[in-house]
């Protein structure tokens, strides 16, 4: 489902560019952060060194690319591992990636990569003030009769510069209703002018944001859980500021200091490959257990009106694997079991979407499902 977008963010209520409160920790702050790692440069320092540049003592001045477009895991821009004060903000994570992969950011990055002792700071002008306030996801999602929907794979990706920006793009009832309609949250008799965003963001499965939407229908409040896969979000920062602190190697090569270099930074969040196996036990006729499409139909994965084809959104919502096109491979009974099957499918990212590893090639996925067998 990805690289057109309003498209982000395991790790993911958020603040700043990526900061979720309560169920999701803070991701970014308005201040710059520094990567103090030493790098992986050439350790030859003259004397017995064999590198020609080391003997000449070249000093490289970082030259940033005007546009940087990358794709990959959410963890590259949102700390999905640490919590609380140990959680790194988005500035820090981008700075670390620049130091580790300077060739992606600088025209002379291959040269910089060979030098030790320089460091990077980044300023994305991320707003640290959270606008997602109110009840935590764990509370509002537990309200009785909450209607759930997930942003369809056919909907456009969303370009945002922060989670505050995501909310600002949903600043009218008309815009909120439109995105709800695209997520199977359609209520024909609801007051079209009553749609509002409420409470904190939620984040589950490492790849699904949850937005609380309310509307009025027949005098009563509708409570909705709008899910947006993070792979539908693109982080786009105009004039991302990058500064480099010089190295001070007494022998060999060095990197010169530069301040406030700017680039237009775009990050396409990749699709997480993990699947969540279904827990329900649908009915399956014993006579159908050898037919893969009938097994998948029993799981509710086929298209309405055409049971020979899979419905991408139905499969995605069940397995938690979003923005892919699915094809059936096999449904094989588990050895020694009467009611358990190993299901294999092929999944390929839709146009403009990629896996977390940056590729968009077809991959095989598998999971087990248990059925209630019927008939003789």
UniProtKB/Swiss-Prot annotation:
- Which segments carry the region annotation Disordered? 33-59
What would be one Gene Ontology cellular-component term for the protein?
Answer: plasma membrane
Q: Which PROSITE patterns match?
A: PROKAR_LIPOPROTEIN
Membrane-topology descriptor = Lipid-anchor
Signal peptide extent = 1-30
Mainly resides where? membrane
Identify the domain of life.
Bacteria
Annotated localization? Cell membrane
Per the record, where are the segments of Gly residues compositional bias?
A: 38-51
Q: Which family does it belong to?
A: Belongs to the p35 lipoprotein family.
Q: What is the name listed in the Swiss-Prot or TrEMBL entry for this protein?
A: Lipoprotein p33
- Origin species: Malacoplasma penetrans (strain HF-2) (Mycoplasma penetrans)
């Amino acid at each position: 489902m990805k690289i057109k977008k309003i498209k982000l963010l395991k790790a993911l209520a958020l603040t700043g560019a990526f900061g979720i409160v309560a169920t999701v920790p803070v991701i970014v702050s308005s201040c710059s952060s520094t990567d103090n790692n030493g790098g992986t440069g050439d350790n030859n320092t003259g004397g017995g060194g064999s590198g020609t540049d080391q003997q000449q003592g070249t000093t490289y001045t970082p030259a940033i690319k005007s546009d940087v477009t990358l794709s990959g895991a959410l963890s590259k821009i949102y700390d999905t591992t640490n919590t609380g004060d140990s959680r790194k903000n988005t500035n820090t994570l981008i700075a670390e990636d620049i130091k580790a992969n300077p060739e992606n950011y600088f025209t002379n990055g291959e040269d910089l990569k060979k030098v030790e002792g320089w460091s990077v700071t980044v300023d994305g002008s991320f707003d640290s003030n959270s606008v997602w306030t109110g009840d935590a996801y764990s509370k509002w999602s537990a309200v009785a009769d909450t209607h759930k929907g997930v942003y369809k794979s056919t909907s456009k990706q969303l370009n945002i510069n922060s989670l505050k920006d995501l909310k600002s793009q949903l600043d009218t009832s008309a815009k909120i209703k439109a995105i709800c309609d695209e997520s199977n949250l359609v209520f024909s008799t609801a007051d079209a002018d009553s749609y509002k965003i409420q409470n904190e963001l939620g984040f589950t499965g490492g790849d699904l944001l949850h937005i609380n939407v309310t509307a009025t229908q027949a005098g009563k409040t509708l409570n909705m859980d709008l899910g947006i896969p993070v792979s539908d979000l693109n982080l786009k920062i105009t004039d991302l500021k990058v500064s480099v602190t010089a190295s001070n190697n007494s022998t060999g090569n060095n990197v010169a200091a530069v301040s406030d270099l700017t680039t237009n930074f775009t990050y396409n969040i990749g699709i997480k490959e993990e699947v969540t196996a279904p827990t329900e036990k649908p009915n399956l006729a014993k006579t159908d257990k050898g037919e893969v499409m009938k097994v998948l139909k029993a799981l509710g994965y086929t298209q309405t009106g055409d049971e020979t084809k899979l419905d991408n959104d139905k499969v995605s919502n069940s397995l938690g694997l979003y923005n892919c096109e699915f094809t059936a491979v096999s449904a094989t009974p588990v050895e020694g079991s009467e009611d358990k099957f190993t299901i294999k499918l092929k999944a390929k990212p839709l146009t403009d979407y990629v896996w977390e590893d940056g590729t968009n090639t077809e991959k095989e996925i598998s999971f087990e499902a248990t059925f209630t067998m019927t008939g003789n």
